[in-house]
Amino acid sequence: MKFVDSADLIIKAGKGGDGAVSFLHALFVPNGGPNGGDGGDGGSVYFQGDEGKHSLLDLKLQKKYSAQDGFKGDIKNMHGAKGEDKIIKVPVGTILYDKKTNNILADINENNKLVLIAKGGKGGKGNARFANSRNKAPTIFEAGELGQEFEIRAELKVLADVGFVGLPNAGKSTLLRAISNSKPVVADYPFTTITPQLGVARTKNNDTFIVADLPGLIQGASLGKGLGHQFLKHIERCLVICHIIDASGNFGSEDIIKNYELIRNELKTYNLNLEKRAEIIVLNKMDLDEAQLNLLDEKIINYFKNKKVIQISGLKKENIDQLLFMIYEELKVAKKQSLWELDKNNNQDEMVIYKFEEQKEDIQAYNKGNNRWEIAGETIFKIYQKFPIWTEDNLLMFNEKLKETGVYETLVKKGIKKGDFVKVFDYELEWTD
């Protein structure tokens, strides 16, 4: 089983800035030429791999990301500035899907890898670009193109950094709730957790790591008893093991030591290379009087004196910050060791990368009845968006571009007549011969 963290996002690149319509106005130059500048390109949206991130929690908190629009062109041939790009940092191993097609847009498989997901719209041309020998004072301009927009799903196959192990009812699920955003089922009976529960823990310094509350272990798990191999398979991916022990055991120090050794032996039997893994012994339920008395026993003090031990109460959230700090420090060391390189290459799924291509849409012409027609399609929309009919020259250009698509010829073949009206998105134009 792999843990999968996911987040749904709306990604929007910036719109290009509109081109400007202006003319030179200077002393002794009464009929200056056009000098409207071009608009700037819209900002694009990129995703970047960041090995310092371990979850998609940030993406879940902010579901919409937009790059900045390009700035409009101005007088004196001044070009608008480009919109600022948006860079979204995600953990290495994040895969991005187009929600509509379920195609893979990108596999962020390297640290600092930068991937373009939504391209900003091109800035529109100002009227200075349209001057020619036939039209020396054009009022034609282009609106900036719209930036790309996608609904995407980000998925991260999570390898838990830290595994909570312990006998059933040791308080692992309660502790997971205390240190993370996870909400596992908690009840006062054995085997509450039957599948791994995942949580993102965050220290006071905003360092994060992934914690897995693993199913309660019983004697004989290495031989397949109980949840057996299923449990042990999960823990071999963890870099740090937190051994959670109920310090309030009915039989005092003997109970605590026996429980620790039982699980330790099961892990050894499964050949988990424990000597290479950091271990923290977490004595839980210290809010209970029985636990306080048990830890006064010299046997306990001597047995654990050379081990990393911390006393906490998951229920009362006592000493939790110190536990998180201890875990994170151990994790930093563990990630530098060769074990991390060995583990992260195990059981890697083969990945097929699909090239994302925009769907080409045919031009459509509809007879709506009552002398009303409508034209639509991606190509028609681009012309509509690019040439706002705010000036007479733009209206002429708009018609010329539509004519080039062949849609007018299609309308004639379908029987359009002089005086009919043609709807082009929110424009309605009268047809003339």
Curated annotation (Swiss-Prot):
Its EC number is 3.6.5.-. GO terms for biological process: ribosome biogenesis. Keywords: Cytoplasm, GTP-binding, Hydrolase, Magnesium, Metal-binding, Nucleotide-binding. It is found in: Cytoplasm. Mg(2+) binds at S173, T193. GO terms for cellular component: cytoplasm. GTP binds at residues 166-173, 191-195, 213-216, 284-287, 313-315. Residues 160-332 form the OBG-type G domain. InterPro entries: G_OBG (IPR031167), GTP-bd (IPR006073), GTP-bd_Obg/CgtA (IPR014100), GTP-bd_prot_GTP1/OBG_C_sf (IPR036346), GTP1-OBG_CS (IPR006074), GTP1_OBG_dom (IPR006169), GTP1_OBG_dom_sf (IPR036726), OBG_GTPase (IPR045086). Residues 1-159 form the Obg domain. Residues 355-433 form the OCT domain. Its cofactor is Mg(2+). GO terms for molecular function: GTP binding; GTPase activity; magnesium ion binding. Monomer. Belongs to the TRAFAC class OBG-HflX-like GTPase superfamily. OBG GTPase family. An essential GTPase which binds GTP, GDP and possibly (p)ppGpp with moderate affinity, with high nucleotide exchange rates and a fairly low GTP hydrolysis rate. Plays a role in control of the cell cycle, stress response, ribosome biogenesis and in those bacteria that undergo differentiation, in morphogenesis control. This is GTPase Obg. It comes from Mycoplasma mycoides subsp. mycoides SC (strain CCUG 32753 / NCTC 10114 / PG1). The gene is obg.
